[in-house]
Regions:
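Non-heme di-metal
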Residues: 1-268
């Protein structure tokens, strides 16, 4: 179960309204790598975990913390929109370039759809969707996704940090940067432990089935040959990479039977 407390995990109070920054912060909320994606991914992974309680608790702890981050960013966005102009005459735009910039850059959905509050959208109004989240049932794969998600989220927060001089916003972003450092490191550690147990390739028990002669071949499919530098190096599974300069077309020319005439696939 969840139990809500009205106190935020950390400060989320800007120095002044800024609807442009409110729009930018929507990426860290409802974007592909935003906090909603982390929340739904980690909670789903934790709920479906039937293995070690250590990993289940790690995922549920972090997923629940992501709810707090959703709350913080939503609060920050709402506060950035407090007092922002929602009506302006054409003459006002001409006489006040700053107002024109604000009104031109703010997300109209903040006012029209959400009443000057946050939304589960990215800055361009695209709604968050469950396709951003991952819960495969394989914790090696999921932990790798989690490292990527935290890396992308931290990268975006670092970019947002330099898009504002507001110390209140920066204070919250500094906290998020630190927490995403922790989350990257914890998921990396879990990934390493799981790889030691199950192998570095996901899934790790298919060697007897796959065509292993292709498993460690770098195939040159471009004009450059920079990837040749990996030739002879040892992969994480202990095998050496080989290099194929001119990959062979081994599958022949595909042919197909005509479609049903009622489909009118007139193709000559």
């Amino acid at each position: 179960m969840f139990k809500h407390t009205r106190k935020l995990q950390y400060n989320a109070k800007p120095d002044r309204p800024d609807p442009l920054m409110a729009r930018r912060l929507q990426e860290s909320l409802g974007g592909q790598w935003g906090e909603v994606t982390g929340m739904m991914s980690y909670l789903s992974q934790g709920w479906s975990s039937t293995g070690s309680e250590k990993y289940k608790d790690l995922l549920l702890d972090t997923g629940t913390e992501e709810i707090a981050h959703v709350e913080m960013i939503s609060t920050m966005i709402a506060r950035l929109l407090e007092g922002a102009p929602i009506y302006a005459e054409a003459d006002a735009y001409k006489s006040d370039p700053a107002l024109a910039a604000v009104m031109g850059g703010m997300d109209p959905e903040h006012a029209i759809v959400h009443g000057m509050t946050a939304s589960l959208n990215n800055p361009n109004g695209a709604a968050w969707n469950a396709g951003y989240a991952t819960s495969s049932g394989n914790l090696v794969a999921d932990m790798r996704f989690n490292v990527v998600r935290e890396s992308e989220a931290r990268l975006q927060v670092s970019r947002l940090y330099y898009m504002t001089r507001d110390e209140g916003i920066r204070d919250m972003l500094k906290f998020l940067l630190a927490r995403e450092t922790q989350h990257q490191l914890q998921f990396m550690k879990a990934q390493e432990e799981l790889e030691d147990k199950y192998g570095v390739v996901v899934p790790g028990d298919m060697k007897d089935i796959e065509h292993t002669k292709f498993s460690h071949v770098l195939m040159n499919f471009s004009d450059g040959d920079g990837s040749r530098a990996f030739e002879g190096q040892v992969a994480k599974d202990g095998e050496k990479f080989t290099y194929q300069e001119d990959p062979e077309a081994m599958g022949g020319v595909p042919t197909f039977k005509p479609a049903d005439p009622h489909l009118h696939n007139d193709q000559g």
